[in-house]
A protein has these predicted regions:
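N-terminal export/targeting leaders of redox proteins
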Residues: 1-31, 74, 208-213
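The canonical Cys-X-X-Cys-His
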Residues: 43-49, 105, 141-151, 202
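Electrostatic cytochrome c docking/interface patches
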Residues: 19-40, 52-57, 111-137, 211-213
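Axial heme c-ligation environment in periplasmic c-type cytochrome domains
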Residues: 54-60, 76-120, 155-160, 179-209
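Sequence context surrounding c-type heme c attachment/ligation sites in exported
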Residues: 33-44, 62, 70-71, 133-145, ...
Length: 213
């Protein structure tokens, strides 16, 4: 996969659920292509032109911390992040990116405006809010906001979670819990303490941010 051509990588992407066809006239190996053009003609295929993806199979990138995005792209490029979407889609794409291109793409998506989502089930929202703000004390699980910020906006190397797809968040929590696909994170220990119901609740609450307030 690491040596996959741009066209092959994009062919894989266009066959995946939730991806729409885009113009494929740019070569990722060309460092002179502006980040906005790469985002529009390549990344938008799954993540949306403005980073607000439609399909929960692909994360929303709008408003994400640029440092976090850059780190994830670097991890894809070096194959350190090996969860299934990583090696199926992002390894081939990120292999073509230079450091400057990664920085430019991260800054582009960080400047996009995240969509606001409607709240989910009221009981789920209440349970998710409790975990986000207070943690799960009897399991010694810290509040999510301790690392991700009181508005789930992300802090430093910790990602923005506000407005992210519920299904995507749940899948990532299971990746942390069940695999070694995302090493070097405190989330692995935390997710081992959470039930499936607790994961669903906090992910549903985060998807509705900031309308949950």
């Amino acid at each position: 996969m690491r040596g996959i051509s741009l066209w092959s990588a994009l062919a894989i992407l266009t066959s995946a659920g939730g991806c729409a066809n885009v113009e494929r006239s740019r070569d990722l190996s060309n460092p002179n292509v502006p980040p906005a053009v790469t985002a529009t003609q390549v990344c938008s295929n799954c993540h949306g032109v403005d980073g607000n993806s439609v399909s929960p199979n692909f994360p929303r990138l709008a408003g994400q911390n640029p440092g976090y995005l850059a780190t994830q792209l670097e991890n894809f490029r070096s194959n350190q992040r090996s969860d299934p979407p990583g090696f199926e889609y992002m390894w081939g794409i990120s292999h073509h990116l230079s450091d400057d291109q990664i920085k430019g793409l991260a800054e582009y998506f960080a400047k996009q405006v995240p969509q606001v989502n409607a709240p989910v089930d009221a009981r789920l929202m209440a349970a998710g809010k409790a975990i986000f703000e207070n943690g799960v004390s009897d399991k010694e699980v810290a509040p999510c906001m301790a690392c991700h910020g009181p508005q789930a906006q992300g802090i430093a190397s910790f990602p923005r979670l506000a407005g992210q797809h519920q299904d995507y968040l749940v899948k990532q929590l299971h990746v942390f819990q069940e695999t070694e696909g995302r090493p070097g994170t405190p989330m692995k220990q935390i997710t081992h303490l959470l039930t499936a119901q607790e994961m669903e609740a906090v992910a549903g609450y985060l998807q509705a941010f900031p309308s949950a307030q």
